[in-house]
Amino acid sequence: MVAANDPGLKETLGEVTRWFFDDYFNRWVSVANRTREEGPEFILDYWGCPLHVCSPTTNRWLIKPEEVTEWLAGMQARLREAGYTHTAVPDSRVTVFHPGGVAIEAIWSRRAGETEVERLALHFQVVRNQDSWRVVAIQFTDTSAKSLDELWPVHRGQHRGHTP
């Protein structure tokens, strides 16, 4: 989603979408399923530090790089124990706020072969830094939803504030 008729924001949309899905997502999956031999430190190329993570059961800041990599290592170990092979993305959306800030939302169906082992809806707050893009906050929840609109519909506010 970008502002109408703004070619700069359309360029940002293409750039960040390629970075997230072609680079970050593919690398994350290949490290998690061990088709790429790397430790969890790779994530510091994509996730900022500090990183805020929030779900129905956690709400915390990961301040140090080792906290970020430990959090990822724990998640990936749990997935590997379940036989993780890949992640399907049944729905996603990218909202460009300005050339330096976007939100990326997705439903991730984490799988062991054809069996779903985990289904999450995720919201990534992503900002541009001097080198590339960085995720600075992640919110997530378990879901059975098939679409983001089903799970997180847009609500238009009806505010009673002062009107000019």
Language-model features: locations:
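Short, cysteine-centered beta-strand-loop-beta hairpins and adjacent loop/turn segments enriched
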Residues: E81, R110-E118
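A solvent-exposed, acidic/Ser-Thr-rich amphipathic alpha-helical stretch
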Residues: E38-G100
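Short beta-strand segments enriched in hydrophobic/aromatic residues
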Residues: W47-G48, W108-R110, Q139-T141
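Short, low-complexity N-terminal intrinsically disordered segments enriched in polar/charged residues
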Residues: M1-Y46, H155-P164
